[in-house]
Amino acid sequence: MTQYIFITGGVVSSLGKGISAASLGAILEARGLRITMIKLDPYINVDPGTMSPFQHGEVFVTHDGAETDLDLGHYERFVNMRATQFHNCTAGRVYLEVIQRERKGDYLGKTVQVIPHITDTIQQYILRAAQGADIAMVEIGGTVGDIESLPFMEAIRQLGTKLGRRDTMFIHLTLVPFISAAGELKTKPTQHSVKELRSIGIQPDMLICRADREIPEDEKAKISLFTNVPAKAVISGLSVKNIYEIPMLYQKQGVDDLVVKHFGLHVKEANLGDWEKVVDAINHPEHEVTVAMVGKYVNLTDAYKSLNEALYHAGIKNKTKVNIRYVDSEDLYSQGTELLAGVDAIVVPGGFGNRGVNGKLRAVQYAREENIPYLGICLGLQIAVVEFARNVLGIKNACSTEWDEKTDEPIIALVAQWVNERGEVEQRDKKMDLGGTLRLGALPAKLKAGSKIATIYGSEIMNERHRHRYEVNANYEKRLEAAGMRISGRSADNDLVEVIEIPSHRWFIGLQSHPEFTSTPLGGHPLFSAFIAAALDYQTERLS
């Protein structure tokens, strides 16, 4: 039978509930438990797919093609789980489902209300996603007291009552700020946050108190007194240099022991040796490289969260500190390639629309002509193909129909049709809704024998996640290959271009997929490890 941990947050947003939950999940998994993690988001969007990265950060794509919250990326990086569409439940999705049922007459003429119809649907999502796990950890987005989150809070309160206290646990994250003028930590915000939580019927079993310094025992006792949480369950959530230290931080304070005792479990002790090796590799690198990331969302680096982490994971594998130099593509176009001076590799990540495209084209040209390692992801592949067509093939008007619908040289064009992972034919055109109309999820690709990408993967098949609408136009493929660009990967039906390389270049690869979504700190990812290794080789040659 699955047992449930519900994680809520109070005082302020952005306390790191996702990281905290994932870190606890990693410890519990190390104790031999099967863990799954679920995110409940109170916004009305059906999914974050059409939200601006400046509003929401990265859209994390699951194996089955759901566009989800970036916290699911944390879950998959910390815990050995494969998230699905049911592991991220938004208010918009819940309301849409309930309204659709009402229109079909499923409620048999009843008045449809928040309680029980909305709250029951939320609970159904939780129970469905939790199947097969020993412990399901459920993070509720937002802050206690937000009007948007009330249906979700009520849903988990009801579920806790139905399942019983022995099978449910509530963990609340709060902030304990240090007031420099007074020279002390203040516990009052935490007291009031728990009071708000208790007013809706939820008594927390554990508090994780975010602070920039250790919380003294007398302050923990004070928090315990006013919140009805045992002092030993008041945990210091200290800020750390890197997030992969957090499992050890929590284990030292006995967080996992509190969970195991609460649920009455008899399991082995956690061995976090692998996590300790990760932290040691981060803290004691033997080398250092600088990678330029050229994009248009660089002022909010969470827009590239999984890519950032994948590069850091590759650094771990290469015993290398990876410094990411974020370069705004519009600045690059206006100020020139001096912004790329001294970098050891260049990556152009995914994106949509035509803003900043010219700067990305300039970055690709610089990498190609200066023989600097280049990795293009999704849009980064398309940019590389257009740049090659313009400056090598001499097709000066080469463009994407995403940037110019009337272009007479559509090197990149709309994906009109493909077969999805379920074997169903998907069709798209420009008149369709934006939301949920991309080529999404993990899709297999065949790699050309002897290609660099096949060597890196150690296989002639790869299966990475996608999120795009546009593809390389098949009418230009022969000309591209004749000029020196190799199409080294195609979708399993040999239809769509998945990977391109320039064999004459030291390391130049573009992928239509998003391999960053499957990189983990413990396992890394072969593509990014090879990319950072190439950056090291280039640096050695550049400095010699």
From Swiss-Prot:
Glutamine amidotransferase type-1 domain residues: 290-541
Catalytic residues, chain numbering: C378 (nucleophile), H514, E516
Keyword hit for Signal: no
Keywords per UniProt: ATP-binding, Glutamine amidotransferase, Ligase, Magnesium, Metal-binding, Nucleotide-binding, Pyrimidine biosynthesis
Keyword Phosphoprotein on entry: no
Pathway where it operates: Pyrimidine metabolism; CTP biosynthesis via de novo pathway; CTP from UDP: step 2/2
Binding site for UTP: S13, K186, T187, K188, P189, T190, Q191, K222
GO cellular component: cytosol
InterPro entries attached to this UniProt entry: Class_I_gatase-like, CTP_synthase, CTP_synthase_N, GATASE, GATase1_CTP_Synthase, P-loop_NTPase
Enzyme class: ligase
Name of the protein in question: CTP synthase
Activity control mechanisms: Allosterically activated by GTP, when glutamine is the substrate; GTP has no effect on the reaction when ammonia is the substrate. The allosteric effector GTP functions by stabilizing the protein conformation that binds the tetrahedral intermediate(s) formed during glutamine hydrolysis. Inhibited by the product CTP, via allosteric rather than competitive inhibition.
Domain of life, per lineage: Bacteria
Assembly behavior: Homotetramer.
